[in-house]
């Protein structure tokens, strides 16, 4: 079986800025919710049997306590923020497993779920549906892959190396050096993508990079200056790597079959009608997901 893990936050942002405004009868902006719902149901109609959507129910996470400049909900359009809880409600009614993250981020949920699902021998592939470079650290061979659904590009481990110049395990170190503007941390001055990739392709992790740049023997611009910066900014480099490292110790499910889609709830049609969303056929009640009381 294949497991599809969807970045609901990314999808909501993408549809919000791609679609014209639509409001429901109560005046709520719902265009992005409609777009994401249609997209997820399209995946199911296309053959996805096991699917879960992770969202940032609250934009802030534990990382905001580590770095004051880390991303927050400031500046996000109120009409967009208001659709997070609505999206979660609609997807749950549609029968889709939703993980609304509070202390952790949606990316953490996807990372934890990918690792957990990949341990199941019945799982042939885990598909991370997001273009977010953070999730590249979770890619493993061709078993855990990353899918950019908008561009229809699937990246396996070889693809990560081709794209970033480093293996998945080095992605947090890479982001620590180059920074991530979307997440709000700057990286180290002077450390660009090419030099960072060249150094980490050889040494893998920050701790393994020699302090003496003459030992590097890689094609990097101004290696002496880079070495000095790394030494001077060492604490920030380690902190930024911690920000970039996704948490995989979050327990989200006990069995991957909990992610199987078994059809919408009885209240979905009424909710969908309010959104003028696509209706789906309901599966027999006997085949619906087992209750938590039956879990081992």
Each model region followed by its residue ranges:
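Domain-level signal for Mg2+-assisted phosphodiester chemistry and nucleotide/NA-binding surfaces
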Residues: 1-95, 151, 258
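Extended two-metal-dependent nuclease catalytic cores across DNA- and RNA-processing enzymes
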Residues: 22, 73-254, 278
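Short alpha-helical interface elements
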Residues: 31-34, 38-41, 61, 65-68, ...
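Conserved beta-strand edge residues that scaffold enzyme active sites
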Residues: 57-58, 105, 286
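Low-complexity, acidic/Ser/Thr- and charged residue-rich accessory regions of DNA metabolism proteins
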Residues: 229-296
């Amino acid at each position: 079986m294949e497991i599809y893990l969807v970045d609901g936050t990314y999808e909501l942002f993408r549809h919000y800025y791609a679609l014209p405004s639509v409001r429901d009868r109560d005046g709520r902006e719902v265009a992005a919710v409609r777009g994401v719902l249609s997209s997820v149901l399209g995946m199911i109609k296309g053959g996805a049997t096991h699917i879960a959507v992770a969202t940032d129910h609250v934009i802030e996470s534990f990382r905001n306590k580590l770095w004051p400049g880390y991303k927050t909900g400031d500046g996000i359009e109120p009409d967009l923020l208001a659709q997070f809880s609505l999206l979660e409600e609609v997807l749950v009614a549609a029968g889709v497993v939703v993980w609304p993250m509070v202390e952790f981020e949606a990316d953490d949920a996807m990372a934890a779920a990918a690792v957990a699902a990949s341990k199941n021998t019945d799982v042939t592939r885990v598909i991370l549906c997001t273009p977010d470079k953070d999730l590249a650290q979770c890619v493993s061979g061709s078993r855990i892959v990353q899918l950019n659904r908008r561009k229809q590009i699937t990246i396996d481990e070889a693809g990560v190396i081709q794209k970033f110049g480093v293996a998945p395990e080095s992605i947090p170190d890479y982001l620590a050096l180059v920074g991530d503007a979307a997440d709000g941390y700057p990286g180290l001055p002077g450390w660009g993508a090419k030099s960072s990739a060249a150094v980490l392709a050889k040494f893998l992790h920050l701790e393994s990079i020699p302090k003496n740049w003459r030992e590097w023997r890689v094609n990097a611009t101004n290696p002496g200056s880079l070495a000095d910066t790394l030494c001077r900014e060492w604490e920030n480099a380690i902190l930024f790597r911690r920000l970039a490292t996704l948490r995989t110790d979050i327990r989200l499910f006990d069995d991957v079959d909990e992610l199987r889609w078994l059809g919408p709830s009885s209240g979905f049609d009424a909710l969908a009608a309010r959104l003028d969303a696509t209706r789906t056929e309901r599966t027999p009640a006997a085949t619906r997901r087992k209750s938590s009381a039956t879990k081992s």
